[in-house]
């Protein structure tokens, strides 16, 4: 069983499944020095800032009037809170915020909402230390692995570090990762059902004796490398920030004003009873890009629905692509005119 670095409900049970459902997006656990009211208020304000980052995938401007107003009335955003004990007599405050109010605050500061179904990222990280190169696992580099785990959790980024067991090592080597050879890396990543794959290398640059980290998505150009320089732990954490930033730009939905009131028509097949119809409607409404679902017509076992979107058609397409419960009906050999327009089959959750 592979070891996942993020507390999630795994909703992929077949090769068709592209994403996982992230839990506790609107919850944050933060270290506190005591249980006084002032400590709770200070920690709650910091936690709200971190939750805004998790939900949107973007860094929020703390100086914005909307955010400053929100932290002055922080109890209004809190759904519940509780204290928990940690190691070495540490105390943590666990706060759950009200989702609707967080979403409204993001809209008011001009930031998008990244839904709770997010692409799983497989990270292959090679480290060169004293001329020895090795891939990161929990056993080989436990501190780096823990840092990746903590950082990805804070950013709401589902992340898996490959096991590097015999099956992996028969397909991919540290040289493949170091040299950004996509083919073996992508092949080895198939067992993890990752939607996106990142290869990275961490080493000391001999020219300035400083740690450097080069990373890229495996589906990008060989030359599309992102370079980070600085403290080793800092740049490893920065890589996770950068990956989350780039994916949020690709997948997050920003509220837009539509001339047509944001209405979009879609056809669903594969519904044969009322229970399935309700499941379909609830599933669609769970997508952050969809505000409302209206059933318009049922004809020839096809359910014609009208969606009210908070994003655009591309946002909807990306959200449905990530959702395993829907499969787009599309014939790559047919002409554009012959293909059904905006038609999906409901396959449900396996």
Ranges and model annotations:
Residues 2-8:
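Sec-dependent signal peptide recognition
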Residues 14-16:
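N-terminal signal peptide c-region/cleavage motif recognized by signal peptidases
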Residues 22-33, 189-237, 342-349:
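Amphipathic beta-strand/beta-sheet edge segments enriched in Tyr/Trp
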Residues 31-35, 96-102, 126-130, 164, ...:
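Solvent-exposed coil/turn segments that connect beta secondary-structure elements
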Residues 42-57, 94-97, 106-113, 153-158, ...:
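C-terminal/domain-edge helix-coil "capping" segments
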Residues 45-66, 119, 123-178, 280-310, ...:
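N-terminal segment of the mature soluble domain
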Residues 62-126, 134-139, 143:
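Signal peptide-directed extracytoplasmic domains
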Residues 74-83, 160-163, 176-210, 320-323, ...:
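A short, hydrophobic beta-strand-centered structural micro-motif
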């Amino acid at each position: 069983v592979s070891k996942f670095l993020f507390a999630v409900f795994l909703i992929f049970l077949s090769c068709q499944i592209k994403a996982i459902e992230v839990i506790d997006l609107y919850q944050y656990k933060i270290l506190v020095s005591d249980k006084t009211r002032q400590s709770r208020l200070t920690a709650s304000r910091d936690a709200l800032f971190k939750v805004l980052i998790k939900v949107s995938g973007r860094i929020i401007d703390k100086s914005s009037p909307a955010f400053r107003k929100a932290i002055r009335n922080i109890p209004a955003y809190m759904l519940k809170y509780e204290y928990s004990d940690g190691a070495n007599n540490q105390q943590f405050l666990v706060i759950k915020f009200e989702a609707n109010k967080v979403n409204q605050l993001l809209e008011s500061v001009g930031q998008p909402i990244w839904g709770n179904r997010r692409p799983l990222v497989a990270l292959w990280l090679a480290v060169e230390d004293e001329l020895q190169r090795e891939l990161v696992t929990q056993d080989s580099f436990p501190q780096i692995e823990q840092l990746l785990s903590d950082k990805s959790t804070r950013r709401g980024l589902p992340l898996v570090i490959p096991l590097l067991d015999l099956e992996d090592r028969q397909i991919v080597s540290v040289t493949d990762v170091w040299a950004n050879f996509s083919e073996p890396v992508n092949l080895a990543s198939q067992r993890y059902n990752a939607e996106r794959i990142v290869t990275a290398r961490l080493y000391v640059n001999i020219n300035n004796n400083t740690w450097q980290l080069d990373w890229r998505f495996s589906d990008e150009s060989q030359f599309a490398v992102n370079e980070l320089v600085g403290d080793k732990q800092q740049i490893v954490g920065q890589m996770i920030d950068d990956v989350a930033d780039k994916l949020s730009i690709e997948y997050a939905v920003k509220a837009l004003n539509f001339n047509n009131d944001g209405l979009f028509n879609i056809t669903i097949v594969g519904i044969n009873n009322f229970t399935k119809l309700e499941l379909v409607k609830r599933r669609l409404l769970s997508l952050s890009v969809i505000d409302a679902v209206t059933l318009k017509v049922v004809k020839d076992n096809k359910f014609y629905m009208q969606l009210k979107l908070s994003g655009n058609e591309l946002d909807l397409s990306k959200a449905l692509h990530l959702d395993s419960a829907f499969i787009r009906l599309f014939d790559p050999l047919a002409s554009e005119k012959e293909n059904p327009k905006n038609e999906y089959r409901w396959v449900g959750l396996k």
